[in-house]
């Protein structure tokens, strides 16, 4: 909860070391992604499994191939060929991917071909060899806070999709507690650590 987050922030003296922004809006988060910043989102209950679905996720701009290079080399410390996956608004799916059967894929379990016209648009969130994506299709009622970030990103960029990878370092489990999130933030090159009611930034984030 927020109290546990606040305590972890105090315990790690983050206020004196970084910029803290209270109650960041979805549009502010979208603006950081649009600027090329890498944002780690920690929200509510833990997630576990093979995929992160927005509440323990590292987010980046899918339009920038440098997002892949930076996350691999300075955050996830993993092999260059391992692809990242996108989270997209459900209503964007038909526009972005080939899905003739209208399949709904909320858990990143199905692979789809990107439509030809979008292969150059989101290079960071597709398989570099076969140009497929394994998307999380997101309805607002499933995760309003996360959905609103993606919707705000669409307002800015015309694309209702973000790069989403699990919030952890390579070889470690997905972060569970605020302390885990802060530890991973401090040991990596993540730009912004986003909790529900506060954001911790390595620099002075624009609004």
Give residue spans per PLM region.
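Flexible beta->alpha loop and helix N-cap segments adjacent to enzyme active/binding sites
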Residues: 1-207
């Amino acid at each position: 909860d927020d109290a546990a987050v606040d305590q972890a922030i105090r315990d790690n003296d983050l206020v004196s070391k970084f910029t803290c922004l209270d109650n960041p809006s979805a549009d502010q988060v979208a603006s950081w992604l649009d600027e090329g910043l890498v944002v780690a989102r920690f929200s509510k209950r833990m997630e576990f499994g093979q995929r992160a679905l927005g509440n323990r996720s590292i987010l980046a701009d899918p339009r920038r191939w440098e997002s892949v290079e930076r996350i691999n080399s300075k955050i996830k410390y993993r092999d260059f060929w391992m692809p990242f996956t996108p989270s997209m608004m459900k209503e964007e799916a038909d526009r972005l991917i080939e899905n003739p059967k209208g399949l709904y894929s909320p858990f990143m379990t199905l692979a789809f071909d990107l439509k030809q016209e979008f292969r150059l648009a989101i290079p960071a969130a597709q398989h570099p060899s076969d140009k497929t994506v394994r998307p999380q299709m997101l309805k607002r009622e499933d995760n309003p806070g996360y959905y609103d970030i993606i919707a705000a990103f669409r307002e800015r960029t015309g694309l209702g999709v973000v790069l989403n990878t699990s919030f952890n370092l390579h070889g470690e489990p997905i972060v569970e507690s605020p302390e885990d999130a802060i530890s991973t933030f401090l040991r990596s090159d993540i730009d912004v650590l986003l909790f529900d009611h506060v954001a911790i930034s390595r620099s002075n984030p624009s609004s």
